Amino acid sequence: MKNKLKKFFKYFTFLFLLSLIILYGYNNIELYVNKISISSNGNNVNTDILKTQIKEKIKLQNFFNVNPVNIQKELINHPWIKKIEVYKKFPDKLILKITERVAIAIFNDVSLVDESGNIFKKLKKKKNLLKFYADDQKEVKYIYDFYKKFIKFQNLNNIQIDISYIKINSIKEFEVRTKANNLIYFGSKNIDERLGRFIQLYRSIELENLNNVEYFDMRYTNGVSVKKRR
């Protein structure tokens, strides 16, 4: 029994010392990151600037001491980065794979809204995007959910209605303006039913007649009010 314990202790000591030697060697080998590869599904992240920032951050670090998790945590704060993977490839390469946010709308003419309904960046350049309007940015989620339903109903009925803006007021009533300059009042109740009713009505009206419609008021229980342009 004692011999077995001695053998085990010797074996354990050997492995421990070997590990220390390997770690010491890794930390003292002059091996650094010389290549940084960045791929992205969009073009809103400036990869050249990103490479410069990363090089500055890790320039004095041994390849084995570079921590991909720390780089990932730092870069995820970039407004356009939705997801990022960072990993090393021996002997001297750092690889980054970026998934960018997709801007689908502009909130109150000042901020961008992404494909998940999140406000993520101040608008700097004019963009031809759908507009969301509300008194409070907390209402963006309600507008986004309404927008997704509107698109779903269009897809189910094989129809396309180009939207200029969606607005919600303080009592959560929805108002939509199309790019054909039709205004639609949906109110705040029975949204699914009213959307379905509107889609059926819209597809039954010929294009030239749509151009003569000022607004559709869907806030009726069984019908709709249509006002023509003068």
Summary of predicted features, one role per range:
Residues M1-K6:
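N-terminal positive-inside, membrane-proximal cytosolic segments immediately preceding the first
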Residues F9-N27:
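Hydrophobic membrane-insertion alpha-helices, especially the h-region
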Residues N27-K126:
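Terminal hydrophobic membrane-targeting helix
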Residues I29, I76-K82, K152-D162, E206-N211:
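Short secondary-structure junctions
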Residues S40-G42, I98-V102, A134-D136, T178-A180, ...:
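Flexible glycine-/small-residue-rich
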Residues T47, K51, K55, P68, ...:
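Extracytoplasmic/secreted envelope proteins and their assembly/folding machinery
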Residues L94-S170, V176-R177, L183:
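Extracytoplasmic segments of membrane-associated envelope/inner-membrane machinery
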Residues K189-R230:
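Extracytoplasmic/luminal low-complexity segments enriched in Pro/Gly and acidic/polar residues
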